[in-house]
């Protein structure tokens, strides 16, 4: 692995983050052969925000106007991709405030909230409410893990006011939650 001068590393770091704003400090440290702390110091010197803030910025710029059914800041997790009436993806980092103190396992309502708010966000109407949800928790999620929720809208049925949204949440490639959300939707008058 090539060793870069501080100036070269910082220039390449800036380019790497511009190309992929979702890259983690750990991935950058590995890429440049330095410590995570060095990457963090470089980011601070370059006024580049941490991953969480970069994700929020990308989501607010790209999706704030797209999501009609609820304000973007009410979505649990950060939306990283959305195609209204089709699909959506969000990420949620499990931190200490989301887990049971004794065993560091995430409280189920956080996983449910991420999936439910994503199912709501993918509906293109101003009013979208969950009428029924069937959720299966496949495995526990631990503090420090990242949950990636993927919502997929099923083709329309006879009842146009109800849309079914399937949500699957993963940690890495491992399924942790599977849900079916029946969403009532209408344009507010």
Swiss-Prot record:
GO annotation, biological process: fatty acid biosynthetic process; negative regulation of DNA-templated transcription; negative regulation of fatty acid biosynthetic process
GO molecular function: DNA binding; DNA-binding transcription factor activity
Protein keywords: DNA-binding, Fatty acid biosynthesis, Fatty acid metabolism, Lipid biosynthesis, Lipid metabolism, Repressor, Transcription, Transcription regulation
SUPFAM superfamilies the UniProt entry points to: Thioesterase/thiol ester dehydrase-isomerase (SSF54637)
Stored HAMAP family: Transcrip_fact_FapR (MF_01814)
NCBIfam families per record: PRK04424.1 (NF003359)
Function recorded in the entry: Transcriptional factor involved in regulation of membrane lipid biosynthesis by repressing genes involved in fatty acid and phospholipid metabolism.
Family: Belongs to the FapR family.
UniProt name for this protein: Transcription factor FapR
Species for this entry: Listeria welshimeri serovar 6b (strain ATCC 35897 / DSM 20650 / CCUG 15529 / CIP 8149 / NCTC 11857 / SLCC 5334 / V8)
């Amino acid at each position: 692995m090539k060793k870069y001068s501080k100036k070269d590393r910082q220039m390449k770091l800036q380019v790497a983050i511009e190309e992929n704003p979702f890259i983690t400090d750990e991935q950058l440290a590995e890429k440049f052969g330095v410590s995570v702390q060095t990457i963090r110091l470089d980011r601070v010197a370059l006024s580049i925000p941490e991953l969480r803030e970069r994700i929020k910025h990308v989501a607010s710029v790209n999706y704030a106007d797209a999501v009609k059914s609820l304000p973007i800041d009410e979505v649990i997790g950060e939306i990283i991709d959305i195609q209204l009436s089709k699909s959506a993806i969000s990420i949620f980092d499990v931190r200490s405030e989301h887990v049971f103190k004794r065993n560091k396992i995430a409280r189920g309502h956080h996983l449910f909230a991420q999936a439910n708010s994503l199912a709501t966000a993918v509906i293109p109407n101003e009013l979208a409410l969950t009428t029924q949800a069937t959720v299966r928790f496949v495995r526990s999620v631990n503090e420090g893990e990242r949950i990636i929720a993927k919502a997929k809208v099923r083709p329309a049925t006879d009842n146009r006011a109800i849309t079914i949204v399937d949500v699957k949440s993963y940690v890495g490639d491992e399924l942790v939650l599977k849900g079916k959300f029946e969403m009532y939707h209408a344009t507010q008058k």
